[in-house]
Amino acid sequence: LGIFDIPMLSNIPNLVYLAPVTKEDYLAMIDWAVEQNEHPVAVRVPASVISDGKPVAKNFSKLNKYEVTEQGSSVAIIALGSFYGLGQQAAKAIESRTGKKPTLINPYFITGTDDELLEKLKADHSVVITLEDGILNGGFGEKIARFYGNSDMKVLCYGLRKEFLDRYDAGEVMKANRLTPDQIAEDVINTL
């Protein structure tokens, strides 16, 4: 895991840092990065080569526009890049325990916030969850939490503690950081 890149790269001025979910996303982002001249671009490498079969956006020129992939209410899950699959699993666990279908969001952009979408969530959501496969300190979730700082929205940020990991069991690291679907659902129930 490259767990320290998000805080380092996402705060460089004018840099666009993208987080693909699938191999197709990754290739489309690389193509866009090469074809456009407006910004320096960095693209994370997805942890898996999954394909969901849906059409892939080819143009990322509208910076910081997130994609709502499942519409729900009460809880919104913003699942970054390789943790999008975890977001899908957490959404199912939350729905099965609460009866409320969460909104699931693929942000694509690590470097900025979709202020328009985040503002809209205030109307019918009370909890926003962020999922990122990197350290929390200075990461993506902190950007979302900062956006909601002066509001009643509760933000639960999930990622890794700031520590060096060497020869580790990924499952144990996930459990230790409350990054399993059941742990996330439990936290949401306690927060609602």
Where on the chain are the PLM-derived regions?
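Thiamine diphosphate
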Residues: 1, 35-192
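Conserved thiamine diphosphate
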Residues: 1-36, 187
